[in-house]
Amino acid sequence: MHMKAKITDVAQRANVSISTVSHVLNHTRFVSEETRKKVMDAVEELGYSPDASGRTFRTGKKMMIGLVVPDITNSVFASLIEDVDDVISKHGYNLVISNTRDCLKTEKQAVRNLASGVVDGIVIAPTSEDFQTIKQQMPDKFPMIFMDRVLSDRNYDSVIADCQEATAKMLREMIENGFRKIGFLVGVPWISSTYERVKIYRQIMEQYEIPESEQYIRYIDRQKDSYDEVGKLFAAGCTAIVATNTAMTHIVLNYVEDKNLKLGEEIVVGGFVDSDFANRFMYKIPVVYEPMEEMGKLAGEMIVEKIEDKNKKFSVKALLCEYDSNDFYRKQAAKYKGTGNTDSTQTKSTL
């Protein structure tokens, strides 16, 4: 019968002390990269698996971090899982994922379960509107980092994307190129990112004196509902639509393709994307880039630091989004004028 490898076997194979092996595996002291590699190679060769209960007893840590997301099918959060895991795994932590489906009851249960001794800390993209709702589910000073959304009653340790200026640029350019009836697809109304984007939309519409724009704001509870809402907006006379996440942007473009609409002539689409890779499949439309990879990695580093020092304060760290028109309007200028109005002023008044 094959004997299970012990820590002494790893130390002997790597030609280091048992304490060095322990420091490498538990991240309790600096060890040179050369020595760390020797230890990890020995662990791999011997198939050594540390005793988790013993490690918890010695260090007080489970070496597990929870990640609570509202929609695992959304590419933004799928990417977030990978980015957070990339960072925390280098510190010896494993990831436990909980998908809440934007359900507050599920979110409360997930936080309560994870914080009850399963994980050392949590990264969360919350469905809840306020901090107190989440705080009630976990012990005092439990390490937690909020992602993508901030809560109404407290600036807790958070990583967010600041898309206000990028969104404003996209909307201004649409209007200045003659598109005044702009449909605006956003997520559920009670989360901070939705609130901020709708706020910018209203400000720009007011600035350009487009009072009827309020009817073109559509709150999407389920991604699959986006398709039907695009049809309703197009039927209502919208000649431009902005989709404020990658999944919705894909759905809008699917609608355009299904209905054989001429992109740039009959309708213009502005999208939010989380990577340049995603943009390659979007006809080079105007886009707002959300720095999701950077946000995920930053959240990973922050939660590890928070676990190491529960009194550490970060407050809100905002990463700027970028707007890229992809030179769309210049390339499509002739087509825009071919919608039935050759005079640009006349076009602006009719679209």
Where are these regions (language model features)?
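Short acidic capping loops at alpha-helix termini that bridge into adjacent secondary structure
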Residues: R180-K181, E212-Q215, K262-V268
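N-terminal helix-turn-helix DNA-binding module of bacterial transcription factors
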Residues: M1-K61, V76, K335, T347, ...
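Short, solvent-exposed amphipathic alpha-helices that sit
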Residues: K38, V76-K90, A166-M170, S192-P211, ...
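An alpha-beta-alpha
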Residues: M170-Y208, K312-K331
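Flexible loop/turn connectors
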Residues: E229-L351
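Hydrophobic alpha-helical segments within soluble ligand-binding/sensing domains
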Residues: V159-F184, K199-I200, Q223-G231, T249, ...
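Short beta-strand elements in bilobed, periplasmic/extracellular small-molecule ligand-binding domains
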Residues: I88-N99, E206-Q223
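Alpha-helical recognition/docking segments in bacterial nutrient-uptake
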Residues: M1-H2, G60-R172, E176, E229-A236
